[in-house]
Amino acid sequence: SGSCTSQVCWNAMPKLRQISEALLKSHIQAYHMMYSKRSLKLRPLQERNRNPSKTDIVYLTPDYCEPNKRHGSLGTHGRRCNKTSTGVNGCRLMCCGRGYQTMLRHVTESCHCRF
């Protein structure tokens, strides 16, 4: 007597929740890279225990400190900054580590006061 057995195999996608959690984890652990003009290679902006693998997410941010006509950036050299601000207009961020000069101006204005 002959018996026949059949085997069916298929691949199934993981649940959407599993996919989204994996993507979120990859996004959070993404490597912020910087292009080194000296070595002509990408290197991580922050030191880590290992270099990114082929499956890790990496990203670049343009250097807004230096002028780049191709990308429409005028750079930050010569612009005024706010010494007390921690935002994008603050000297710490805008001056890109180049330092800055403090300028003190004395302005006399008429306040139209009446006594």
Curated annotation (Swiss-Prot):
Record organism: Strongylocentrotus purpuratus (Purple sea urchin)
GO molecular function, one term: signaling receptor binding
Primary location group: secreted
Compartments where found: Secreted, Extracellular space, Extracellular matrix
Pfam entry (one): wnt
PTM description: Palmitoleoylation is required for efficient binding to frizzled receptors. Depalmitoleoylation leads to Wnt signaling pathway inhibition.
Name of the protein this chain belongs to: Protein Wnt-2
Keyword Oxidoreductase: no
Top-level division of the source organism's lineage: Eukaryota
Covalently attached lipid (O-palmitoleoyl serine), positions: 1
Record bears the keyword Disulfide bond: yes
Intrachain disulfide bonds: 81-96
SMART domains: WNT1 (SM00097)
